[in-house]
Curated annotation (Swiss-Prot):
UniProt: Zn(2+) binding residues: 247, 252, 254, 260
Cofactor stoichiometry and binding remark: Binds 1 zinc ion per subunit.
GO CC terms in record: cytoplasm
InterPro entries: G_CP_dom (IPR030378), NA-bd_OB-fold (IPR012340), P-loop_NTPase (IPR027417), Ribosome_biogen_GTPase_RsgA (IPR004881), RsgA_GTPase_dom (IPR010914), RsgA_N (IPR031944)
Keyword list, A-Z: Cytoplasm, GTP-binding, Hydrolase, Metal-binding, Nucleotide-binding, Ribosome biogenesis, RNA-binding, rRNA-binding, Zinc
Official protein name in the record: Small ribosomal subunit biogenesis GTPase RsgA
Similarity remark: Belongs to the TRAFAC class YlqF/YawG GTPase family. RsgA subfamily.
Pfam assignment, any one: RsgA_N
One biological process term in Gene Ontology: ribosomal small subunit biogenesis
Organism: Bacillus cereus (strain ATCC 14579 / DSM 31 / CCUG 7414 / JCM 2152 / NBRC 15305 / NCIMB 9373 / NCTC 2599 / NRRL B-3711)
Amino acid sequence: MPEGKIIKALSGFYYVQHEEGVTQCRGRGVFRKNKITPLVGDQVVFQADNPTEGYVLEVFDRKNELVRPPIANVDQAILVFSAVEPDFNPGLLDRFLVLIEYHNIKPIICISKMDLVDEKMKATVEAYANDYREMGYDVLFTSINTSESIDILKPYLENCVSVVAGQSGVGKSSMLNVLRPELELKTNDISSHLGRGKHTTRHVELIAIGSGLVADTPGFSSLDFIDIEVEDLTYCFPELKEASQYCKFRGCTHLSEPKCAVKAAVEEGKITEYRYKNYKQFVEEIRERKPRY
């Protein structure tokens, strides 16, 4: 039986890409019976009834799965944040990073609209970028008005499945339009009333850009830590994870425990205060989370 990857799911149909093209498939009834929903990004076995139509027979095990957006087997996330309009927001970036790290997806931080900043804001954003690079993250500067800066992103998209996510109104769709102009994805300017952009993408689809596949997603419509526990959180902050191995107590939450290596690293300036502050805020959110039944 032929195998392929689901690149689009729409109205009960799954569009499976394979060596000979794309086949529009339906799911077998056994999926509903077993409560399995094929997702964009799934590697599947399918049966072709004719050159253009068929059925999905089997879904292979997933290495990861996101709920919002509904996509599986993601290799990396391009987290797009703007320098201005809206202003760069490290607190929101850290929230995205935690969610991405928790799902074992490699993050690439992409800061857009650098052509719109004044010198003061440029220095501020570059300082943040240097902090994140020291934590081990890749950080890129882009502008949709210069193709050269977008070209910097292209090598990161090769031979992998990427999710584009980030704050609304930062230019995610505009960036993909520059990478592949024939997409003609809709874009929205910032709402003067709300001070943020309106999401312009409505379904998940994997789009070929070079040798890679990129999903233009709704940008994580939920940023709640639904499945993350306090003990997981340290591992979602690389610099906290590194320091925590030297804490005196196993299971240290890095809040009030004595001889905590993380708190010591903050005091010594090895961990930035804003990252530690965000960590503490996220711990509080998780502890106040209502239980699910």
